[in-house]
Amino acid sequence: MSLRVQNILINSLRQYSKQILKPPGYASPEKTNHLKKFLVDKIRVSGPITVAEYMKTCVSAPLVGYYGQFSKDQKVFGAKGDFITSPELTQLFGEMIGVWVFHELANTGHKGSWQLVELGPGRAQLMNDVLNALAKFNDKDVSVHLVETSDALIDEQEKSLCIYTSKNSIDTPFIRKNKTRTGVNIYWYKSIDDIPDGFTVFIGNEFLDALPIHQFHKSGDSWNEVYVNLTKDGDLCFMKSKGENLHTKGLIPSAIRDDSSRVTWECSPESGTVVNQIVDRITTFGGFSLLVDYGHDGSRNTHSFRAYKNHKQVDTLENPGLADLTADVDFGYLSTLVKDRVVIYGPNEQREFLAQLGIEHRLRRLLQVCKDRKQQEQLIESYNMLMGDMGLKFKAWALFPKTLEFILEQRGGPAGFSAKKKTTEN
């Protein structure tokens, strides 16, 4: 989206959003109507929009988008929000990620300073647990870098990770700088491009699934893109393009076109951009990455775009800006974009990944120090959720520079992936 288009979008949304500019803590029950009115008016004036544009607007539009709401009291994560993430369930998840990061870092042979980058940190629960795990190894060379587009969430993350709050910086690549409770330098950025050069470890949990997707449907021998349009009554609805367009011709790979069993497909070019940015970094300056998300290896043959409100699946078009929009990550598609430049492991089921890291052993240790039976039961329940349905739906996907390929092969793969050959060999 060009800067000019972004400015037009922001100015238009401000026009519709005047009524919700209230003092902090005030949450207008009508705030989503402003976004819906904007979308309806936009479609009436300029025509149908892609699912990707609809998703991006609903998620990140200033003031009225899901993560761009004015109110800092918006409940998104956890039991009182719309969805719960693995780090919110139990400290076990973040601790295992922290152990994995340190273990793989040690096996690269890297010495000296390094950067730990998290994409889309949410309320910073994952980073909190990762740093607690790293502290046990007495690592003094790490600095933390968080990529976050929501100012309200940046405030939440700083409150969680730091003792004192700070002010936004001007004329610096980072937008905020502070120290964590354990004295680690921490920085916030709006874009991966602003992170300093250097050896970097990237982590992300439920980040890629929130990025915009394009949806396609096959009719006969032709592929059509799915758009968001209006019914005769002025309600939002889905429709198919009349024929092939620039997106069907430019995004759908020949492997999908040649698959006679395929009638639907979806992809996220924005996710592809993020993954390529990660690969550019780790192949140039050293490092590796671990992304955990809803996803599949490319074999899914149905659309996955959906919305969640209060932990229940709802209509994706009914309340734009009020529900969490998500789509399964096609790790197979992403792997094809970078397989010539990096060594890829996964996607592995989350429960397999965590089991190989020894999460059950860590569970037993934590149960021994629980205060009472109720705390033990809560821990066991969280563990079962992490390793049960969530453990099947979520996948772990790791990227390493090809310079580490021989070492990784000698080890039988990185921790958590020893039971599965790397993607580049499939």
Swiss-Prot record:
Gene Ontology cellular-component annotations: mitochondrion
Top-level taxon of origin: Eukaryota
UniProt entry tagged with the keyword Transferase: yes
Molecular function GO terms recorded: protein-arginine omega-N symmetric methyltransferase activity
Coiled coil: none
Pfam families linked to this entry: Methyltransf_28
InterPro entries in the cross-refs: NDUFAF7, NDUFAF7_sf, SAM-dependent_MTases_sf
GO-annotated biological processes: methylation; mitochondrial respiratory chain complex I assembly
Keywords per UniProt: Methyltransferase, Mitochondrion, Transferase
Leader sequence segment: none
The enzyme's E.C. designation: 2.1.1.320
Compartments, record wording: Mitochondrion
Catalytic reaction(s) noted: L-arginyl-[protein] + 2 S-adenosyl-L-methionine = N(omega),N(omega)'-dimethyl-L-arginyl-[protein] + 2 S-adenosyl-L-homocysteine + 2 H(+)
Entry similarity comment: Belongs to the NDUFAF7 family.
Protein's job: Arginine methyltransferase involved in the assembly or stability of mitochondrial NADH:ubiquinone oxidoreductase complex (complex I).
Descriptive protein name: Protein arginine methyltransferase NDUFAF7 homolog, mitochondrial
Species, as recorded: Caenorhabditis elegans
